[in-house]
Amino acid sequence: MSLTKEDIINAIAEMSVKDVVELISAMEEKFGVSAAAATVAVAAGPAAAVEEQTEFTVMLSSVGDKKVNVIKAVRELTGLGLKEAKDLVEAAPKAVKEGVSKADAEAAKAKLEEAGALVEVK
């Protein structure tokens, strides 16, 4: 008669912590694996993805009460005409610039915030 997974789990549940640690060590030796190495590799994955972001989007979240100043700032940043800039501002939340470097995104954010807008960089 062979043991089922449930039998093994029940047996482990009845063991002391010391015995479980010894069991894990024995399994690591027998199968040539390490539980700690797998945890480190998984934890490092998301951090690497965040560091790789090179393109950013400047989102106009809200215009505020200085709409004219925000329209002027949008025109300067994008080169849009008056009507297009006005339409973009009135459609907030909307992307003002996409695929720009971090420095350009931060500069655009500062300019729009100075004009009175609420801005987010993604």
Swiss-Prot record:
Alphabetized InterPro entries for the sequence: Ribosomal_bL12, Ribosomal_bL12_C, Ribosomal_bL12_C/ClpS-like, Ribosomal_bL12_oligo, Ribosomal_bL12_oligo_N_sf
GO biological-process terms attached to the record: translation
Signal peptide, first to last residue: none
Classification via PANTHER family: 39S RIBOSOMAL PROTEIN L12, LARGE RIBOSOMAL SUBUNIT PROTEIN BL12M
Record Pfam families: Ribosomal_L12 (PF00542), Ribosomal_L12_N (PF16320)
UniProt keyword Ribonucleoprotein present: yes
Keywords, comma-separated and alphabetical: Ribonucleoprotein, Ribosomal protein
CDD domains associated with the record: Ribosomal_L7_L12 (cd00387)
Keyword set includes Cell membrane: no
Stated role: Forms part of the ribosomal stalk which helps the ribosome interact with GTP-bound translation factors. Is thus essential for accurate translation.
CC terms in the record's Gene Ontology section: cytosolic large ribosomal subunit
Taxonomy of the source species: Bacteria, Pseudomonadati, Pseudomonadota, Gammaproteobacteria, Cellvibrionales
Sequence similarity: Belongs to the bacterial ribosomal protein bL12 family.
Domain of life, per lineage: Bacteria
Name the UniProt record assigns to this protein: Large ribosomal subunit protein bL12
GO molecular function terms noted in the UniProt entry: mRNA binding; structural constituent of ribosome
Description of how the protein assembles with itself and partners: Homodimer. Part of the ribosomal stalk of the 50S ribosomal subunit. Forms a multimeric L10(L12)X complex, where L10 forms an elongated spine to which 2 to 4 L12 dimers bind in a sequential fashion. Binds GTP-bound translation factors.
